[in-house]
A protein has these predicted regions:
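Short linear capping/connector segments at secondary-structure termini
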Residues: 1-3, 30-39
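Hydrophobic alpha-helical connector segments
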Residues: 1-22
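Residue-level recognition of alpha-helical structural elements
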Residues: 2-6, 40, 67-71, 93-101
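Residue-level detector of well-ordered alpha-helical segments, enriched
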Residues: 9, 13, 27, 74-78, ...
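Amphipathic, non-transmembrane alpha-helical scaffold segments
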Residues: 10, 41-52, 75
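C-terminal peripheral helix-coil segments that are non-catalytic and often amphipathic
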Residues: 19, 53-61, 65, 75-123
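Short loop-to-helix capping motifs
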Residues: 23-24, 37
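Short, structured loop/turn "capping" segments at alpha-beta junctions
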Residues: 24-31, 55
Length: 123
């Protein structure tokens, strides 16, 4: 497969997200905009929860995951944290710069690394 470690899978996923943000202005606005539209924010949070669930399943499909906390959606939170980095880049530069794209990936991976050991056995 295209990856042998969870770190590589995490980078692959974030790169796909970045490709969507960069190719689709509407997606970028919806996900990254600093708007006060609470219902849009709610929808976005719901979207993050669903994506978090999908991401957990994707990681679980490829690796033997440790038991994850029941009270925190680690994968959804990792995405929200990296989204904040991308939003900051859009705020400052009106685009997600390569440097900030890299920082977002690092934030995503670093947060997951608090819950996933450095090495996970593949399925």
């Amino acid at each position: 497969s295209a990856f042998s470690t969870w770190h590589e899978l995490s980078r692959l996923i974030e790169q796909r997200m970045l490709d969507i943000y960069n190719d689709d202005a509407a997606a970028r606005q919806l996900i990254l905009a600093q708007h006060g539209l609470s219902e849009v924010v709610q929808a976005d949070r719901q979207h993050d929860m669903e994506l978090g669930d999908l991401m957990y399943k994707l990681f679980d499909q490829h690796f033997h995951l440790p038991v994850m906390p029941g009270d925190v959606d680690v994968f959804a939170l990792a995405m929200e944290l990296s989204d904040r980095v991308y939003a900051r880049s859009v705020q400052l530069h009106e685009a997600i710069t390569p440097r900030m794209a890299e920082e977002g990936k690092r934030v995503f991976e670093a947060y997951l690394g608090l819950y996933l050991p450095p090495f996970l056995a593949k399925r």
